[in-house]
Structures are given as structure tokens and as C-alpha cells.
Amino acid sequence: MTSAVETKTEDRDLVLTRFIAAAPNKVYRAWSEPELLKQWFAPLPFTTPVAELDLRPGGVSRIVMRGPDGTDMPNAGVYLEVVPNRRLVFTDAFRGPGWEPSEKPFMTVVLTFESEGEGTRYTARVRHGTVADRETHEHMGFHQGWAICANQLAALAEGLA
């Protein structure tokens, strides 16, 4: 399990990339099956009690992370692109069916799952509308939090049959 974090490929992007010793379909399953996503999505000791995924362009995603103190952090969004086993793109710019705009869009996430040797080159590119939003996300702990989650994702995907 090796990780590399690339901070700014563009002035508004944050990027995490790593090799996962599991086939792309297994890494994709961990992102696309609610019961699997709940097992790794939040950095421990946080949990993910809710994962509702309508995995199609225009489909709604509703994920809730719960902190150790019981505080819920809802994450709502819409899928923009779904290419099974290869690519997922979603955004929080919309929060429900009918393309209802969010009050404060923050990011669009582009996930790629590329076959590499005996595993997957996993890349999460998180695009922000402004440099200030990217900086806010960085200061919130993007690198540490997303790296922890990528480790949890890898452990789960590598154990899938």
C-alpha cells in the first residue's frame, strides 16, 4: 500500500493518488455498493450510518458521516458521470432530483480506477470553484482525512472476493 498526495495540479484542485492491490472492479464496488461504502468512507473513529446511492448520471447521493460525539455531517450530491469500474464523477453543486442547486457548492469529485499490474491506480481529484475553497478544504485536513479513507478503502477492496 503506497500513497502519494499531489497538492495542486491546478490552483483549485486537490489530488490523492495511490496504488491499491485489488482489481478496479473491487475498488469501484467499494464506492458503488452502499453497504461496502459504509465500512470505509469516514475516517475512523467516525462512522457512516447512511449511504444512499442512485448510481446513474443525475442520480442523487446521500451519505451521512457521524462523529464520535454523535454529530451528523450530511453529504448530498448528484452523480454527473458513471462509468462502471473506471470512473465516477459527482458534485455537491446540486442536492436533489431535478438539479436543485445547493446553497453553497463546494466541490466536484472525479474518481478514476485504472488497471495497473495486479491492482488499481486510484485517483481522487477534488475540484473546487475557487482557490479559497480549495485552501479551506486543505486546512480542514483533506490530505490526512482522504489518505486515511484511501487506506480504509484499500483494506476493504483488497479483501473482497
What does each of the following model-derived ranges do?
Residues 98-144:
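Beta-strand/loop substructures that line and gate deep hydrophobic ligand-binding cavities in soluble
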Residues 50, 156-161:
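Short, highly charged C-terminal tails/helix-capping segments
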Residues 38, 42-43, 49-57, 62, ...:
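Hydrophobic-ligand binding "helix-grip"
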Residues 31, 41, 92, 150, ...:
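Short, flexible helix/strand-to-coil boundary loops that buttress conserved ligand/catalytic motifs
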Residues 1-47:
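Hydrophobic ligand-binding cavity/cleft-lining segments
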Residues 15, 26-28, 62, 87-89, ...:
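General beta-strand recognition
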